[in-house]
Amino acid sequence: MRLFHDASYRFIQARRKAYVVSGIVLTAGVIFMITNVLNTGSWQNYGVDFTGGSLIQIQVYENLSAADLRDALSGSDEITRFGEESEFVVRAPVAEDGSIGAVADEIETQLAAAFGEEAFDVVRTEQVGAKVGGELQLKALYAILFSFLLTLIYLAIRFELRFGMAAVIATLHDIMITLGFLAAFRVEIALPTVAAILTILGYSLNDTIVVFDRIRENMHKKGARKRDPVDLVNQSINETLPRTILTSGTTLAVLVALLVLGGAVIRDFTVVLILGVIIGTYSSIFVASPALIEIQNRWGLGRAGEKKKRPQPATV
């Protein structure tokens, strides 16, 4: 991309402004999470996969609203519009010792009694036990934490410990902002959403490694130890900028097409991925690289994880 071929942007010098922006967004996300806990008892909008219960997607053939369906079900179930105006999703929790099949059958029976069997069709049904839902929550958390651990170990071996720490900071930044977004807009957390979060983690890490690899390459060039580390990191970011813009741009183009044409079933999954690509691109430039500078300035952690006695200027 010739537009950024000879770029010389001073990204690291703008890191404090980026810290402010990230801090504001992260704080807003935490506030939304706390608000959700106070209002609903849960910091996220967990789907049936994680809470247990029954989910029934129905298509109605009469001019029925969510309020009409709620009245037919005695107002005890959560009903939301899904995709087209004639499609709704009914969610009903189930007790630990309850029958999830009985709950789904009861919902269909009540709707048929109120509107007639020809007034609607059941498009799909999902049923998850409460115990299984709790186990899935725990396993999803383990998956994310385990990915952080593997990231740190891999980068500590492949690069140095400080690179691994900086990458984990950037990835944690991306995940927290994504969770804040999900909390703010009450996006349902289901298994596809967790898959999207793990995909974000991988995409963000890939962007970060590309920049870190160029930093390491420039560190080994002749005369690098006499250079200001900030200038060296800026040069590395600028050299990888065309690749970053092209990769993120083409990925976003595909995801936008998927969002427009993919339908409501994968809408939340696609939205989370779009957000993740944008945040991952931002963090690889304004979070990971500045974090590497800050870690080096404060602790100078090298491959063995020990503070160097006399760090050289270009040992970023």
PLM region spans:
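A structural signal for conserved, well-ordered secondary-structure elements
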Residues: M1-V316
